[in-house]
Amino acid sequence: MIKHLFLLLLLTFTTTASSVENIHSFTAGSMNKILSAREGRPFILVFWNLDCQYCPTELKMLNKLKQQYRKELDVVLVSTDTLDDVPQLASRVKSYGIRKIEQWVFASSMPEQLRFEIDKRWYGEVPRTHFYNPAHERIVKTGLVEKKFVEQWLADNKPESKLH
């Protein structure tokens, strides 16, 4: 019995630790890293936090779409919480069923500077979702994004549509 309990605890700790390791520190310059890694490709950048009322709904919806449109849909999550919140963030995201989505968390004592680097007109309200086309022109939505909008954006930004 103790052996089984130990194995269960070890498995739980390992799963949580590996989830935590997949969350990157978002610092000055991180936005450019995210953009550079996706040069010429469309993607969705979602800013959220643990206290956000609408974020669970949006994140679950995006996760379902990610499963449906595996290759066409690239989603990056950035939490505006702090590094101290990483274990909670990993647990929360996992509870939404999210497994293979790139994740970041604000890692600055001055989050205002990070927000300014991302968007000079953003004051921290979440959810805030940026839809980048292949040329990295963006559409910004604040508040809950409807599934219909995301599906239309996907249709407009399929990799095949770049071949004209």
Predicted segments, located by residue:
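Structural microenvironment flanking redox-active thiols in thiol-disulfide oxidoreductases
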Residues: 59-96, 111-114
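Loop/turn elements at helix/coil->beta-strand transitions in domains of secreted/extracellular proteins
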Residues: 38-43, 71-74, 99-101
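Short, internal strand/loop/helix patches
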Residues: 93-126
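N-terminal "domain-start" segment that seeds a small globular fold
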Residues: 15-36
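Thiol-/selenol-based redox modules, centered on thioredoxin-like
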Residues: 126-164
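Solvent-exposed loop/turn segments at secondary-structure junctions
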Residues: 49-53, 80-84, 108-111, 137
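Short active-site neighborhood of thiol/selenol oxidoreductases, capturing the structured segment around
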Residues: 37-53
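Sec-dependent N-terminal signal peptides
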Residues: 4-13
